[in-house]
């Protein structure tokens, strides 16, 4: 089967968070990793300023199913697809969901790949 990669950016709806942010992240990552293990999906989740950026990779159906779940998450809005394409290899082959908190904004603002993702209104 062909590998597929999707990347999206979305704005966080802080009023929909039920737990303090660190607890919300831990709970969400546990759920994501459990689901990804069953689905064969890998990827990364970056928390940047008021947004998250997520990369998902795996077989097309499983990746698109995951994107559909994200689109229905009440904690997110303004979801914007960045990459949707076949992939020759996985960028995160050993990570059910890599996570990095870049909320200070400085690291992301200086990163040549991340900055354009944040410059959208």
Q: Where in the sequence are the language-model features?
A:
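Charge-rich, low-complexity N-terminal segments
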Residues: 1-121
């Amino acid at each position: 089967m062909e590998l597929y990669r999707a990347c999206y950016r979305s704005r966080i709806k802080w009023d929909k968070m039920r737990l303090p942010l660190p607890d919300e992240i831990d709970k969400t990552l546990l759920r994501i990793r459990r689901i990804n293990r069953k689905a064969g999906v890998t990827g990364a989740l970056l928390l940047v300023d008021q947004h998250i950026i997520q990369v998902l990779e795996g077989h097309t159906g499983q990746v698109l199913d995951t994107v559909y779940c994200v689109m229905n998450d009440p904690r997110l809005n303004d979801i914007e697809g960045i990459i949707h394409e076949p992939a020759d290899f996985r960028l995160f082959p050993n990570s059910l969901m890599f996570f990095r908190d870049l909320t200070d904004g400085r690291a992301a603002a200086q990163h040549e790949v991340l900055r354009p993702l944040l410059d959208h209104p």
